[in-house]
UniProtKB/Swiss-Prot annotation:
Protein name per Swiss-Prot or TrEMBL: UPF0328 protein ECU05_1660/ECU11_0070
Organism for this UniProt entry: Encephalitozoon cuniculi (strain GB-M1) (Microsporidian parasite)
InterPro entries assigned to the protein according to its UniProt record, in alphabetical order: UPF0328
Biased composition (Basic and acidic residues): 7-17
Entry-linked Pfam families: DUF2463
Family that this chain belongs to: Belongs to the UPF0328 family.
Chain intervals for the UniProt region annotation (Disordered): 1-23
Length: 239
């Protein structure tokens, strides 16, 4: 008997091209997220309290990048869901699908309104400056970045490469380093020595875990954006 050679299936350039494009988008998305968080924090350390209180343009520049990033990411995800071939069949999946899209619309709308409303409202205290230049940019960018990345992973358009995951961990560590460096140099040395690959090795990106992370993050993001919307409504009511 003669052995018959059966050619193994392989990916064509056309099949690999969309995946490479998706990986590039996630890489650029990660860089944009780091810049969107780092710039407001840098402005917090560069300018003093009185400058923030007196200059509305400075307040506008502080929140423009993170909230623009947030609105762009949620609108992009909404557009991707609308263009996808996924059509929920049963009632439960339809409810989850349309609820997710409704959250994306709400988050994008609140982000756009915040760019207009939050800078006009004077940041009178140091706590207000910290909230608007450190806390809100971090959580706004973090939630949008995680939603984008995990959604791509669940849809299997990319793989969780070392670059993408280390960028995600670096984003979280960078915020803690910058915020705590001002008060304790010992904390900075500790975080600097934390091995990022350790997180990668212990984190298993299963679909079930990613869905649970996405669900938890969306719940936290809902409360956060509700707080932002409440601040915007109070300001608009007092105008």
């Amino acid at each position: 008997m003669s052995n018959t050679h059966v050619p193994e299936p392989h990916e064509t350039n056309e099949q690999r091209h969309p995946t490479n494009q998706s990986r590039s988008k996630v890489t650029y998305n990660g860089l944009a997220s780091v810049i969107s968080v780092a710039l407001p924090i840098a402005m917090y350390f560069i300018f003093d309290k009185d400058r923030f209180k007196e200059d509305p343009l400075l307040r506008f520049a502080t929140i423009l990048l993170p909230f623009s990033y947030s609105a762009t990411q949620y609108l992009f995800l909404l557009y991707a869901n609308w263009k996808s071939n996924y059509k929920p069949e049963d009632t439960l999946h339809k409810a989850l699908y349309y609820s997710f899209n409704a959250l994306l619309i709400a988050f994008a709308t609140i982000s756009i309104l915040s760019i207009v409303a939050l800078p006009i409202d004077g940041w009178g205290s140091r706590n207000d400056i910290v909230i608007h230049s450190v806390i809100l940019p971090f959580f706004v960018v973090w939630s949008a970045y995680l939603t984008f990345t995990i959604n791509c992973l669940i849809m299997k358009t990319i793989r969780l490469t070392d670059v993408n995951f280390c960028m995600l961990i670096a984003l979280m560590m960078m915020i803690r380093i910058i915020v705590e460096f001002k008060s304790s140099n010992r904390e900075y040395r500790y975080y600097r020595q934390m091995p990022t690959p350790m997180f990668r090795d212990t984190f298993l990106p299963t679909i079930k875990r990613m869905v649970s992370i996405l669900t938890t993050m969306l719940v936290l993001a809902t409360f956060m954006y509700a707080f932002i919307a409440w601040k915007c409504l109070i300001f608009l009511r007092n105008m």
